[in-house]
Amino acid sequence: MEQRQLGRSGVRVTRIGLGTMTWGRDTDEHEAAEQMRFFLDAGGNFIDTAAVYGDGDSERVLGGLLGVLVPRDEVVIATKAGISFKTGERKVDNSRTSLIADLDRSLARLGTDNVDLWQIHTWDHATPLEEPLVQWTTP
């Protein structure tokens, strides 16, 4: 499968990624394992998930497959933060505190100490854009 450079990061990702939005919700662990095995056998390496998918179950299922189907360092994991359904309603919170807490929970569910691409899932009108951007700016 053809790979492309991910920006200036030095990371190479396959042109086609494996989306896991239904994992843990409509797709059980066995079917998820089959999908992942097929994707890896086809040469794929880029796996997309998010904290909000299945209220974290997508990341949990993926975390259970890492190290079993593929070594962690052979895949590129992308996840997202900033949306939750904790109160039963969609809540967007891109504040520094919320994003860091989302990342910590994602890492725990994935069973890893890092993700390769971490994204803010959606715009938050209540949080100034500078807040999530400034916190990761290096001098």
Task: Label each region the model flagged.
Residues 51, 83, 124:
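Short, glycine/acidic-enriched loop or turn micro-motifs at the edges of active sites
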Residues 70-72, 83, 136:
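P-loop/Walker A phosphate-binding loop and immediately adjacent motor/lid segment at beta-alpha junctions
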Residues 7-23, 78-91, 114, 119:
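N-terminal small/glycine-rich loop or linker at the start of catalytic domains
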Residues 59, 80, 130-131:
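Acidic-residue sensor for enzyme active/binding pockets
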Residues 86-139:
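Glycine/proline-rich, positively charged
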Residues 1-76:
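N-terminal binding-site loop/beta-alpha segment at the start of enzyme catalytic domains
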